[in-house]
């Protein structure tokens, strides 16, 4: 992901370039575009536009352009990495109230995805590095490359079933 400047207002944006030589990259691009097409919520990262073109060598090039989140990911706040030789580091600590507000923001985004979209969406990759923080430390869930649509009929059939599968460090 790169930081860029867009338009006459010099708006900061995040540019997610997909490396199409990696297995599943095109599928991830399509999934993210489909998931983000019709969803709008204050706690979801806003996609501004997409780019699908050829690069200078004639290879396919795809990128997603997002609203820039100046405070980075929740991961960088929970597990800061200090630079070599940096005595104090850029020590950023979230208070209990800030952490609670971030949890509420993420829960609100998930509630929207699961219960208020035309077809419910399951994120499938929720982890601190995919939770981005704006200027006011409001959380925005991003990276919908693994998202799955759940047809309404399927959700009704599985009301009494639950599953918990995850990776260490994921939410």
Show the residue positions of the predicted features:
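Conserved eukaryotic protein kinase-like
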Residues: 1-171
């Amino acid at each position: 992901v790169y930081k860029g400047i867009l338009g006459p207002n010099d708006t900061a944006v995040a540019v997610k370039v997909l490396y199409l030589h990696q297995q599943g990259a095109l599928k991830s691009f399509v999934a993210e575009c489909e998931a983000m097409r019709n969803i709008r919520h204050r706690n979801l990262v806003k996609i501004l536009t997409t780019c699908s073109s050829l690069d200078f060598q004639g290879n396919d090039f795809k990128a997603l352009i997002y609203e820039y989140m100046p405070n980075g990911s929740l991961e960088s706040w929970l597990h800061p990495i200090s630079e070599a030789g940096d005595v104090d580091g850029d020590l950023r600590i979230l208070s209990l109230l800030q952490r609670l507000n971030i949890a509420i923001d993420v829960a609100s985004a998930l509630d929207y995805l699961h219960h208020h979209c035309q077809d419910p969406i399951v994120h499938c990759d929720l982890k601190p590095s995919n939770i981005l923080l704006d200027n006011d430390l409001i959380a925005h869930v991003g990276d919908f490359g693994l998202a799955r649509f759940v047809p309404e009929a399927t959700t009704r059939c599985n009301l009494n079933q639950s599953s918990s599968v995850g990776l260490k460090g994921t939410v």
